[in-house]
Every structure is written in structure tokens, then in C-alpha cells.
Amino acid sequence: MKISQKGLDFLKDYETLSLQPYSDKIGLKSAPIKSWSEAATIGYGHLILGTEWSKYKTGITKQQAEDLLHSDLVDFEACINKEVKKQQLSQNEYDALVILCFNIGITQFKQSSVLKMLNGLKGNYPTLELAWKAFNKDNGKVSNGLINRRASEWNIYSKNVYKRIN
């Protein structure tokens, strides 16, 4: 499977486009950064590797951001396609899982109670919804933005509603 256009549009809305590199630890409202850090980000949430810094340090075009997002999504789609053993995901379930994985990362997703529960194993939470919404912390602190994002993703997964909660 691949993410749908509705899923892609939803992801782009949450990730927000930045044509200049910024620190994801500070957020989009920060000034563009002039040197690489582990949180260096560009486009729609693309984490810039140290080896990529010279390529992205002066910024990118909107088309390059689109291309980068599509390239990044290949790994997240492959993760969901490989790791989720549920017999058949609906498109909205798949979209929500790709969006979650994009935000928390492949390693976190593979270790998550969300994946365990989807695959019929016991997780650390009584319900899949609670396991999903547990990814609500930024640097160890509960984040209202992440609470809203997880609720929005859950609505996609459980209700097929692609609407951002603010």
C-alpha cells in the first residue's frame, strides 16, 4: 500500500513546509540555522543528516521539498507494509499508521505497543487508542500539540476523518 492523497495532505499540513533549514528542537518559528545539528530539519519534516548538510544548508525549492517528502515516505510505507501483520488495513488505517510512524520514527514504531497490539500481541496499554495517544511527549514533557496530533491521527485511523484538531 501507499499513503493516499488525503493522508499526504494531512501530513503536509502537520509537518508544515520550511524551505530553509531549522532546528526541530526549537520549531519552525525559529530563525533558519546556519550550522548542522542533530535536529536540523527542512522541507516537510525531513531530518537532515550530517552528510546531507552541504546539500541543504542554503535551502530548497518547494518542488525539492515535495520530492524529498515522497522519498522519505518510501521508508515509512515500507515499515508499515512489512511490520503490520493485520490481515488487511483500510486506506485510512494505513494512512494514520504512516503518519504516526513518520512522526515518531521507524525505530520507535517497531518497539511500540501500537505495533504489538495490531499484531495481536499484548501491549503496555489496555486499548490501541491509549497506546497510540501515549506518544504525546516532546523531550519528556507532555505537549498539547502532540496530544492534538495523536487525536487527529486516531480519528483518521478509527473514523476515517481527516481533520486537524488544534
Report residues per predicted region.
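Short, structured surface segments that line ligand/substrate-binding pockets
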Residues: 82-92
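Family-specific signature for flavin-dependent thymidylate synthase
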Residues: 53, 58-62
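Long, amphipathic alpha-helical surface segments
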Residues: 1-9, 13-34, 46-48, 53, ...
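Noncatalytic nucleic-acid binding interfaces
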Residues: 97
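Extracytoplasmic
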Residues: 37-39, 94
